[in-house]
Amino acid sequence: MQPTVRPRRSALYMPASNARAIEKARSLPCDVVILDLEDAVAPEAKVEARASAAAAVKAGGFGRREVVLRVNGLSTPWGADDLAAAAAAGPDAVLVPKVNSPADVEAYDRALAAAPAATRLWAMIETCPAMFELMPIAAASARTRLAAFTMGINDLAKEMKARQTPGREAFVPFLSMAVAAARAYGLIALDGVHNEIDDLAALEPSCQQGAAFGFDGRSVIHPTHIAICNRVYAPPADEVTWAAAVVEAFGRPENEGRGALRVEGRLAERLHLSEAHRLLDLAAAIETAEAS
């Protein structure tokens, strides 16, 4: 049984055509490994990569890492076979591209009908039409396996003909709305990749921006990005300390039934109590993960 709160600070894409990369992923400190059959694999290598990815999922050995298989779209020559292989392999989740509507979610869900019940569906949110269907797409989770939004900023930028700037100004409204739609239906929300592989100085403020929006973590394209994502998307120490104080304060007998308290000079309401429990659970899950 999966923990109620699971860290997803870093989700590393690994080309499924590269056996050495897959083996390396078993020892990297990322929270999620995404075996990629789509963008990272050339057309002539996709069939072999599919077999390799399915074998890797079945073999396991990824430890506490969540294992996700990114497939090609149903409209491509490889999509149906990718989904059949994914259903048979039974990863933690299957990441599907270019989800534009609830109908797309339902089509992918039907294609995964033979998968284990625990296998979830993650949707790439990376097109202009998807930006205006965020709530209906998220609502499809009530009747499908849908469990996560993963942002695809590169494809979105291409469709919008938008420039990718350090502050991501063109995409800020969509990033914020994607998180809100995901949260409205209890979904995971992951930010998109940072394209500048060697510019770690620029990665950190971008992650801080994503964390401020409320993303659970970030998809990454290189192992050197993992440490920064893991640090920035973890609950800050001062927030964990305050969360513990909130839980302790509301747990005192004299505060039973009270809706609001003063905790270390700050207002703490009942809504803060539930968030405090979530932060403490997440911090504990991260501590356990990093000790394993």
PLM features: residue spans?
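Expand to "…catalyze enediolate/carbanion chemistry for C-C bond making/breaking, isomerization
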Residues: 1-292
